């Protein structure tokens, strides 16, 4: 986890040193992206499950709303429910010293029960409610923060079928 802080050390000759740290927040404002294309993808398992999902855009403001839909083209397995999760992946360091951390920010159920062919499930996720930061890619080849939308289908035998889609988050100027 990346953090910014000021550390003050008072060295005393007659006793141990005093050390105090104070964290602070750095906000990097960015202009809104000029192009923001929708994300549309078809995924599936041959002859078992075939879905098409769509998100209205690929780049979101931190207070934006993710709007989308999942359309079931073929359903031959018994789906129990469908979840949508926001995942943050942080990477710090380089080469063999790189440390990766993944955190599920939120997960919620968008559908309960078995869908039928032709069913369309709407998605609406308000990002403002979560503690998110902007996306950072390869800062000095030492640090990155990336976000993913993870769509998960769970069947009756608790098998999980998922598709992750990277999204970009930004803080408006």
Predicted regions and their residues:
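C-terminal beta-sandwich interaction modules and adjacent acidic
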Residues: 1-173
């Amino acid at each position: 986890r990346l953090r910014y802080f000021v550390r003050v050390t008072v060295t005393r000759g007659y006793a141990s040193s005093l050390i105090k740290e104070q964290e602070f927040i750095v906000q990097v404002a960015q202009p809104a992206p000029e192009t923001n294309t929708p994300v549309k993808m078809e995924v599936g398992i041959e002859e078992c499950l075939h879905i098409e999902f769509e998100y209205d855009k690929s780049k979101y403001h931190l207070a934006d709303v993710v709007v989308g839909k999942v359309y079931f083209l073929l359903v031959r397995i018994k789906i129990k429910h469908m979840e949508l999760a926001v995942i943050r992946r942080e990477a710090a360091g380089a080469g063999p010293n790189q440390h990766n951390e993944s955190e599920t920010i939120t997960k919620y159920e968008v559908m309960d029960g078995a869908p039928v062919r032709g069913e369309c499930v709407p998605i609406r996720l308000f990002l403002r409610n979560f503690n998110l930061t902007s996306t950072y890619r390869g800062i000095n080849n030492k640090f990155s923060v990336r976000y993913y939308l993870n769509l998960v289908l769970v069947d009756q035998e608790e098998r999980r079928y998922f598709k992750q889609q990277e999204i970009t988050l930004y803080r408006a100027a």
